Amino acid sequence: MIMVRRRQRPAKEAASSSSGGASSGSGIPVDQALPLNVAGNLLEDQYFASPKRKDCRLMKVTQNGQLPEATMMAHNKDNKAGRTIGVPLATRSQTRTIENFFKANAAAKDSQKTIHTEEQLNLGNQELKLDDEELNGQIKLDDEVLKLADKQINENLPFADEVDAKAEQKLMDEELQQVVEELLFDGSSRASSNSPFYQHDMDVMQEIQQTPEIPHIKKVTEPLEGLGSLADFQTHRSALRDSHSSTHSSSTDNIFLQEPVLTLDIDRTPTKASSIKINRSFELAGAVFSSPPSVLNACLNGRFNQIVSLNGQKEALDLPHFDLDQHDSSSCDSGVACGLTANTESPAGQPRRRKPATPHRILCPSPIKTALKVTGGICKVGSADPLSPRKSPRKLPTTTAAVAACKSRRRLNQPKPQAPYQPQLQKPPSQQQQQQQDDIVVVLDDDDDEGDDEDDVRALIKAAEERENQNKAPATANSNKAGMKTMLKPAPVKSKTKSKGPTKGQPPLPLAATNGNREMTDFFPVRRSVRKTKTAVKEEWMRGLEQAVLEERCDGLQVRHFMGKGRGVVADRPFKRNEFVVEYVGDLISIGEAAEREKRYALDENAGCYMYYFKHKSQQYCIDATVDTGKLGRLINHSRAGNLMTKVVLIKQRPHLVLLAKDDIEPGEELTYDYGDRSKESLLHHPWLAF
């Protein structure tokens, strides 16, 4: 055994020397009392030994009691002459190595002693078996042979004890040498394979693995029980001492004392500096707008970053001027895209109209009627104004007067027939006003025929004659205005309401009579919508169902006989989905009366199932069609995957059950619907309800 022992104090010299002498005189016999006493003294000395004391030495148990007093006093005086543990100031990690070593050695020696004792027991058992065989073979042997065999067995036991004592002494010497080498080498680390501690652990593991399995143990002697309790006591005291120590883990268990195993490889190479370029001008690179930019973008020009071309070239784009139309014809729903698209010049230099903003086109009245009203309504002769009552703004180009003059126009001045247009006023107006009122210009397109020109002249003459007849009446101050209105709006106003276009045998109205405007319906017919709302379609469908019920309609049906079912109904013509097929006709009764009829029908085995229960407006009803009335609705069979469905139709405050096509039905297909009865009693009497 090896222990760490503090040098004995003078007060305890007698006790320690007497105990040491007793132990040395008698040697170390293997019995029950001696190991326990030695272990107790050893653990007690270890518990009170300080790891940082310089007077701690390594010694054997047998040498502890044999030290003379002079030697002990010399060691007390000269501490430096002795052999210290490791370094002058031993740390906790170094002393823990010794403690762990003691634990491992104690466990190894216990296992070795157990192995030796078990081997001896096995040897004795084998000899006993041989003796038993000899006794069985030689029944007539005397009792003296048995005594000799027992004597031989008893002689083997002291011999085994002596062998154990020598082996133990040899192990103690080897362990002492290993501990000294460990302390000099600082072999507390198990990381290196050259460490003595590592090699000792490997040897112990190999010895444990090489131990043979013991087949059977009959007895456990008292010394083995003492050694087992010794190991338990040593482990308990060592754990108790560790619980009171300052540190609870060795350097290898403490994560803060371990070497780092993870390293972070961070790329610290400098990156290229990114640059941001701010443009102070509104620049576009070949952008094509489907609509002109808003005014807000023009106001924010030069304040925010805009689109920059990829090649880095900056080309300023001059934004064109857009005229905002304020009249009604520029609405988005009107189909006119003048206010929503940009006019891009074509290669020929002529303006090209783009696709309207909305996919549909709604016909609106002529813009001349919605524009601002002009006082005279007619143009002066020889004026350079490109607009005229005949031309609307959407037909005129928006460039210059030279472009407008490209279109040939023919102006007809009729000064002679215009004389009767002026009424006789009480006070003659001035010459300038009279000249403005006398000048009436009628503008016609080149595509008008020569016959239209003659009709216009005749219309002017006729209007002049009517004007003369009106002037015969007493003229007043307001007659001039009324006359001008009647001249500008004659009888064609009535023709608008009478007919949409020219009737047969009646010539078209002259342009002068309508102030140079034609009706929109002369060129485009009025589009009438034939679409219906969902509510209107449903109402029409319900009216059709009511009409079919009132007519008791049952066409397209045929009665056939089916094997295992009886009679059934087959479609004789195709039926569309949700189309009326037939009505389930019977007696409409209450629930109470239906219960009484069921009891009465239960007595008749031949009575079928013809009672249909349904709910309408939170009230239960029943239609009893048990009585054969010749209606086909009662003959339609059951199927959980039927092609008909029921619907309640209310006619004159009375609910009716009608059968509608659930899907498209082809001719020759059997008509079925789901009865909906899933009760156990019904399935017991009518199993076909499950299919």
UniProtKB/Swiss-Prot annotation:
GO cellular component, one term: polytene chromosome
GO biological process: cell division; chromosome condensation; DNA damage checkpoint signaling; heterochromatin formation; methylation; regulation of DNA damage response, signal transduction by p53 class mediator; regulation of transcription by RNA polymerase II
Location(s), subcellular: Nucleus; Chromosome
Residue stretches of biased makeup (Polar residues): 421-430, 471-481
Coiled coil start-end: none
Protein EC: 2.1.1.361
GO molecular function: histone H4K20 methyltransferase activity; histone H4K20 monomethyltransferase activity
Residues where Phosphothreonine is found: T252, T344
Region (Disordered) location: 1-29, 341-363, 382-401, 407-437, 464-516
Record-annotated SET domain positions: 555-676
Pfam families: SET
Source organism, top-level taxon: Eukaryota
The keyword Cell division is assigned to this record: yes
Family: Belongs to the class V-like SAM-binding methyltransferase superfamily. Histone-lysine methyltransferase family. PR/SET subfamily.
Name the record gives this protein: Histone-lysine N-methyltransferase Set8
Organism of provenance: Drosophila melanogaster
Lineage, uppermost ranks: Eukaryota, Metazoa, Ecdysozoa, Arthropoda, Hexapoda
Gene: Set8
